[in-house]
Amino acid sequence: MSLITRLLTGNNTLRLRALESLGKAGYSSHAKFSEHKPIERIRNIGISAHIDSGKTTLTERILFYTGRIAEMHEVRGKDNVGATMDSMELERQRGITIQSAATYTLWKDTNINIIDTPGHVDFTVEVERALRVLDGAVLVLCAVGGVQSQTLTVNRQMKRYNVPCLAFINKLDRLGSNPYRVLSQMRSKMNHNAAFIQLPIGVESNCKGIVDLVREKAIYFEGEHGMDIRLDEIPQDMRVESLERRQELIEHLSNADETLGELFLEEKPFTEDDIKAALRRTCINRTFTPVLVGTALKNKGVQPLLDAVLDYLPNPGEVENLGFIEKEGQDPEKVVLNPARDGKDPFVGLAFKLEAGRFGQLTYLRCYQGVLRKGDNIFNARTNKKVRIARLVRLHSNQMEDVNEVYAGDIFALFGVDCASGDTFTTNPKNNLSMESIFVPEPVVSMAIKPNNTKDRDNFSKAIARFTKEDPTFHFFFDNDVKETLVSGMGELHLEIYAQRMEREYGCPVTLGKPKVAFRETLVGPCEFDYLHKKQSGGSGQYARIIGVMEPLPPNQNTLLEFVDETVGTNVPKQFVPGVEKGYREMAEKGMLSGHKLSGIRFRLQDGGHHIVDSSELAFMLAAHGAIKEVFQNGSWQILEPIMLVEVTAPEEFQGAVMGHLSKRHGIITGTEGTEGWFTVYAEVPLNDMFGYAGELRSSTQGKGEFTMEYSRYSPCLPDVQDQIVRQYQESQGLAQPDKKKKKN
């Protein structure tokens, strides 16, 4: 048992000052934390949730109780130190988490690797990366806010990567906290088979402790910082409720677990171990979600949560991780990676995050198989580049601790490795093994950006190069038509944060233009083409003919571009087909209606013709350019715009005003719900109509309303919106005639 948490039962009172004993126990040295444990004694967990649910505060308490840090600081504390995991100055100033921070610690002789992730929708890719490499997660929910929009996003991401999770209902001390409502929302909104394994003894200011339904004991957190745990009998006034909730827990478990279900049907008695074993099995299979309660800020419920992480979340050996061996002309062969920490199999690791540190590029990796030692050579499966390992580090927020070797299941970092996030590394370059990479959403907002001083251009270029490499949702390009540098990302906040980081970290103040929506252009119906590109200018000329059809993809694929080669025979030689595809993808960068990218289109190359001397890849590329210009003229086109899922919460008296404003912004209301004087409305609103909404909501709800939005899909614009976008584009290109002239004609 950890020295910091003591169990106090009866008169056997262990009274040791925790911080005095830390030094004697060797907690100050990193060696205790970085010891290599057997696989059963390792957990890789993430802490993720909606914005402001208390993830970072919870991580701070976990680090304190496990002896990793000697004192606690609050996220927005009066001492201005900030939480350990919010290491970026901007994070401490704003009180939000922007980047995932990694750390590892020790609890009851088990090594726990923790990744603290952002809750803000603009930083979704950070959560994606973290969940991809974790074996389990703690889903933190606010006892007041309950299941919110980003909670649903995180839930979808966990489902995508099959991550088992525990739920922790935090902030029991807040006014209006209602953990029972949160549980019913988990069942209705997230479709979780969930039940309490703990109950709160009082909420709001009466929050005294928790009831453990598995052990049937009350737990109180006493002493300084709630370090002393006292077990007692369940309070008299809670015994009936505890029995009912325990029965409910057993029923939910029996539905999901065969072994317990048989005992339940045969009406045999359960032991504590039976319930714990069933909880572990169902949690790992994602058929049941145990719900714990507490308040991290008031130091209640954190130690039992750590026990639950050990008891119910899987170790790396209990999770199946697959690699894929690419074979030409065949489907990739699936290989189950060996999680044993014996080093018998070759090393396989996945790079899941890049960061430019003070000492060069830092690459975060998870080791899935084998062992990696200092001095080893590894190969990037995508580029086949060899890298020699000069330095291996484990991370504790922004501090590094050197290690000599890492085993399967460990999370670690390397310096000076040239790669992209999602790359697979192996020690054997011949096996062509790669792991499924990380899902990256498309950016939806663009802004013009320029440095305030021309002398800062070098630093500006360095910052852009670093940020685009670190964050795959942050894009950068130069628009030749308007001679502007544009950056695109997941939202206004996302781009504002990068602008502020340029000033803080590179001394390069920048000006951001107005947000621009990333519209797309697509075809309404199929359009055939037959284009001949012929050029003779002395010597060998250029000759290429292509015949085919361009057609729209189904609405659920309208962000994709497809190219299909349907040619038969040698009219279009196979070596020239890539030229046609290249020409098509080049032309897709800029549409005719509004200058935005094309998407949701399939290009079917069906036939063509070539000349034995004059045909070349370049000629076929130019033929594709000509064919698409032909389709621009002959086809029927429309503009697509990003639609956002918007969730607004405000007091009930403002419901009419909020609904009216959303309708005015072309929003479609998809649902509403109300609880205790507050209402929540869900709507789908075009992103183009959402700019300036934050100010409008504040003024119409006396500052009490709040909203979140996240990208949902692309959908066709309204006709008048499309006409306006086309007209603005034509005017900017000098193509439009003034209205007055039209009237004269």
Swiss-Prot record:
GO terms for cellular component: mitochondrion; nucleus. GO terms for biological process: mitochondrial translational elongation. Residues 40-317 form the tr-type G domain. Pathway: Protein biosynthesis; polypeptide chain elongation. Its main location: mitochondrion. Gene3D superfamilies: 3.30.230.10, 3.30.70.240, Elongation Factor G (Translational Gtpase), domain 3 (3.30.70.870), P-loop containing nucleotide triphosphate hydrolases (3.40.50.300), Translation factors (2.40.30.10). One of its GO terms (molecular function) is GTPase activity. GTP binds at residues 49-56, 116-120, 170-173. It comes from the Eukaryota. InterPro entries: EFG_II, EFG_III, EFG_III/V, EFG_IV, EFG_V, EFG_V-like, EFTu-like_2, G_TR_CS. It is found in: Mitochondrion. CDD domains: EF-G, EFG_III, EFG_mtEFG1_IV, mtEFG1_C, mtEFG1_II_like. SMART domains: EFG_C, EFG_IV. Keywords: Elongation factor, GTP-binding, Mitochondrion, Nucleotide-binding, Protein biosynthesis. SUPFAM superfamilies: EF-G C-terminal domain-like, P-loop containing nucleoside triphosphate hydrolases, Ribosomal protein S5 domain 2-like, Translation proteins. This protein may be expected to contain an N-terminal transit peptide but none has been predicted. Mitochondrial GTPase that catalyzes the GTP-dependent ribosomal translocation step during translation elongation. During this step, the ribosome changes from the pre-translocational (PRE) to the post-translocational (POST) state as the newly formed A-site-bound peptidyl-tRNA and P-site-bound deacylated tRNA move to the P and E sites, respectively. Catalyzes the coordinated movement of the two tRNA molecules, the mRNA and conformational changes in the ribosome. Belongs to the TRAFAC class translation factor GTPase superfamily. Classic translation factor GTPase family. EF-G/EF-2 subfamily. NCBIfam families: EF-G, PRK12740.1-5, small_GTP. This is Elongation factor G, mitochondrial. The gene is mEFG1.
